[in-house]
Each structure stands twice: as structure tokens, then as C-alpha cells.
């Protein structure tokens, strides 16, 4: 995924009201940017460190800039825009980067499915094999050298796991794909200390046949891509 033009840079001052952040530019100007990450952003907020943002030319937007990436106090790059995870996953699948998800003829996005009024992030289809339902999650929480998901209690995430288990029961393939948007994360685990119900459900989903995958990203202000598989601890 190439970013044209590359993201602009500033220093984080503060995040507030969940969807806003104030950034100090190199010329001393202070701007307010939109924060597209609705999570807690635990261990992703480092005031005084570098952040990168994109700029929209849509005149109807109240805030023209969108927070895209952040630097941690250890120098790692974190993908803040969770909305990019699905596109990164789709691009990697189409490029054959995710070896477990090759060999399908069609890829569809945001397809309605399940009994709980859900939409699957990605659906792979082929005439000669079962459909493959893929739920994509952005993983950015790093604590004591370990990557975790989720960074806050997620009833929505629990619902998605139930839906994936149901797809397996119906004879389909179901995959939970963690897109690791943090260059310091090398392994992913369920955040049992944050959402024990999600952690338990993830174990149940794995035992029921849901495949759990994680792929790390290469991130820069000019490009982003999935590069390699990383272990998942259940």
C-alpha cells in the first residue's frame, strides 16, 4: 500500500474526546486532527513523540487531517488507523503473501452473514472449495514485549468469534486474522487481563476449528504492507 502523498509529520500533544488529537507541526503551528481509532489506544499514546497524518481535500470535512501512524517511546512505529487493516489484509491475500489464504478465485468485502446481523470483513470464494470467512483485527497493544488483543473489552469482538464458529459448523472455513500494526510486536496473545471473556471465547473458537493467524506489518510514512507470519499464543 503506497501513500501518495506520504504522510506529514508532527509531534503529539494530546488525544481527547476519543476522536480528536492535537499535533504540533515543525513550524510551531498547532493543529487538531481526526483520530480514526475508537479503542483505548493503550500504550499507543506518547505525547512529545512523532505522529504522522494524512490530509483530505474534501471541503466538507470538519477536520482535514487523519491520524495514521505514531512513534512509540522505544522508536517503534504503530498504525493508528484501524480502518487500514482490512485493506492491508486484502492486498496481502491478493499478492499471495498470506500462504494460508491462497488458491481462491474471488475476494469480496463487507458481506452480510451470520445470525447476529454481522458483516464479514473479507470473504474468499472458489468453485472447488468451501467459502472462507475472514474477520480482520488490528493489533497494536505491546506490553512487556508481548503483543495483545484486544486493548479494551470488546463485546463486538466476542460476537464475531461466535459468528465464525457458526460458519465452521455450517461447513465453511473461518479465519481470525490479526494485522499487527506495531513494529515492536513479534507474537500475539489474547489479552486475558483486559477481556477474559474474549480470551476464553478465542480458545473455544480455535478448538471449534476457527483458524487464528497473525501477520506483522512493515510501516513507514510512505507505505505499509504485511510481510510475515508471527506466532499466536492461545
From Swiss-Prot:
Q: Which Gene3D superfamilies match?
A: 2.40.50.580, 3.40.1350.60
Pfam annotation, one family = SfsA
In alphabetical order, the GO MF annotations are: DNA binding
Database matches in HAMAP family: SfsA
Q: Which family does it belong to?
A: Belongs to the SfsA family.
- Can you name this protein? Sugar fermentation stimulation protein homolog
Report which gene this protein is encoded by: sfsA
Amino acid at each position: 500500500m503506497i501513500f501518495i502523498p506520504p504522510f506529514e509529520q508532527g509531534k503529539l500533544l494530546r488525544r481527547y474526546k476519543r476522536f480528536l488529537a492535537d499535533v504540533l507541526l515543525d513550524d510551531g503551528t498547532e493543529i487538531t486532527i481526526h483520530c480514526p481509532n475508537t479503542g483505548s489506544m493503550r500504550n499507543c499514546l506518547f505525547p512529545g513523540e512523532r505522529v504522522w497524518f494524512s490530509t483530505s481535500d474534501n471541503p466538507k470535512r470538519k477536520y482535514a487531517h487523519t491520524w495514521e501512524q505514531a512513534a512509540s517511546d522505544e522508536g517503534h512505529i504503530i498504525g493508528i488507523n484501524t480502518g487500514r487493516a482490512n485493506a492491508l489484509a486484502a492486498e496481502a491475500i491478493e499478492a499471495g503473501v498470506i500462504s494460508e489464504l491462497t488458491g481462491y478465485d474471488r475476494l469480496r468485502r463487507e458481506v452480510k452473514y451470520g445470525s447476529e446481523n454481522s458483516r464479514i470483513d473479507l470473504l474468499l470464494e472458489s468453485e472447488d472449495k468451501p467459502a472462507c470467512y475472514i474477520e480482520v483485527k488490528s493489533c497494536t497493544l505491546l506490553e512487556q514485549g508481548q503483543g495483545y488483543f484486544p486493548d479494551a473489552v470488546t463485546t463486538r469482538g466476542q460476537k464475531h468469534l461466535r459468528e465464525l464458529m457458526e460458519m465452521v459448523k455450517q461447513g465453511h472455513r473461518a479465519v481470525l486474522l490479526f494485522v499487527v500494526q506495531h513494529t515492536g510486536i513479534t507474537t500475539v496473545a489474547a489479552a486475558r487481563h483486559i477481556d477474559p471473556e474474549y480470551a476464553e471465547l478465542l480458545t473455544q473458537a480455535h478448538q471449534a476449528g476457527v483458524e487464528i493467524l497473525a501477520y506483522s506489518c512493515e510501516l513507514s510514512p510512505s507505505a505499509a504492507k504485511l510481510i510475515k507470519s508471527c506466532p499466536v499464543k492461545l
